[in-house]
UniProtKB/Swiss-Prot annotation:
Protein name: Protein-L-isoaspartate O-methyltransferase
Predominant cellular place of this UniProt entry's protein: cytoplasm
Family in the record: Belongs to the methyltransferase superfamily. L-isoaspartyl/D-aspartyl protein methyltransferase family.
NCBIfam families for this protein: pimt, PRK00312.1
GO CC term (a single one): cytoplasm
E.C. designation(s): 2.1.1.77
Subcellular location as annotated: Cytoplasm
GO molecular function, one term: protein-L-isoaspartate (D-aspartate) O-methyltransferase activity
Catalytic reaction annotation: [protein]-L-isoaspartate + S-adenosyl-L-methionine = [protein]-L-isoaspartate alpha-methyl ester + S-adenosyl-L-homocysteine
InterPro entries: PCMT, SAM-dependent_MTases_sf
Active site feature: S64
Lineage: Bacteria, Pseudomonadati, Bacteroidota, Cytophagia, Cytophagales
Length: 221
C-alpha cells in the first residue's frame, strides 16, 4: 500500500495534535511521523487512520490510539540499542514505533492469527524484530533480561515474572486495573529487591490474557 504525500501530511497534523495533548518527546514524535499507520488498518477504517482514535483489528483486539502509543513510548525513556520486550504485538503499529526509536524489539502475541498477520506486515515494511506467539503475561524469559518491558494490554496486577526479567535500572510500563479502565504504571527496578512505582494516568486497554492475566475464554481471573 502506498504511503503518499497526503498520508504524510495527515501524519504531520497528527503530530501537532499529540503535541497539543502534551507529548513532548521529540524523538517519539519523529518516530510516529515515520510510521505509515494507515497500512495497519482494515480498509473500512483507512480514511480515519490519522485520527487520534483506536480501531478494531480482529480477535477482539485494537490498534491503539496514537496518543496512547506516544505516551507509553515516552514513559519508557528509550535509547538506541536497548533490548525491549513488547507484550502484545497486536497490529504491529506500536512495535514499528519502537523500532523507529532504534531499539531491539522482542515482541510476543497471544492470538496466532494476529501474530502471523503482524509479523508478515512488519517484515514487508522492512522492520526487523524477533516475533513470538505465546503467553506474554509470563514474559519471554529465555531472551531476558531486558532494558525495557512494555505491555500493550490491561493486566489485573503486575506479573512478578516481568519484574524478574527486567535488568537492574530497567523500566516496565504496564496498564493495571479492571477490564474497563487501568492506571498506567511505570515501574523502575532500582535493585534486585527494590522497585519504585509511578502512576501515569488513566487509560483503557483490551485485557491481557494468559496465566498471569485474564482468562482468554471467560475474561475472568
Amino acid at each position: 500500500m502506498e504511503d503518499s504525500y497526503l498520508h504524510k501530511g495527515l501524519r504531520r497534523k497528527l503530530i501537532k495534535i499529540l503535541r497539543d495533548k502534551g507529548i513532548q518527546d521529540e524523538l517519539v514524535l519523529q518516530a510516529i511521523d515515520r510510521v505509515p499507520r494507515h497500512i495497519f488498518l482494515d480498509n473500512a477504517f483507512l480514511e480515519h487512520a490519522y485520527q487520534d482514535k483506536a480501531f478494531p483489528i480482529g480477535d477482539g483486539q485494537t490498534i491503539s490510539q496514537p496518543y496512547t502509543v506516544a505516551s507509553q513510548t515516552s514513559l519508557l525513556k528509550l535509547s538506541p540499542g536497548m533490548k525491549v520486550l513488547e507484550i502484545g504485538t497486536g497490529s504491529g503499529y506500536q512495535c514499528s514505533v519502537l523500532l523507529e526509536m532504534g531499539v531491539n524489539v522482542f515482541t510476543i502475541e497471544y492470538h496466532k492469527s494476529l501474530f502471523e498477520k503482524s509479523k508478515k506486515m512488519l517484515q514487508s515494511l522492512g522492520y526487523k524484530a524477533q516475533f513470538f506467539c505465546g503467553d506474554g503475561s509470563e514474559g519471554l524469559a529465555r531472551f531476558g533480561p531486558y532494558d525495557r518491558i512494555l505491555a500493550t494490554a490491561g493486566a489485573p496486577y503486575v506479573p512478578q515474572k516481568l519484574l524478574e526479567q527486567l535488568k537492574v535500572g530497567g523500566i516496565l510500563v504496564i496498564p493495571v486495573g479492571d477490564q474497563k479502565t487501568q492506571k498506567m504504571l511505570r515501574l523502575t527496578k532500582v535493585t534486585e529487591k527494590e522497585i519504585t512505582q509511578e502512576e501515569c494516568g488513566d487509560f483503557r486497554f483490551v485485557p491481557l490474557v494468559g496465566k498471569d492475566g485474564w482468562n482468554a475464554k471467560t475474561n475472568k481471573l
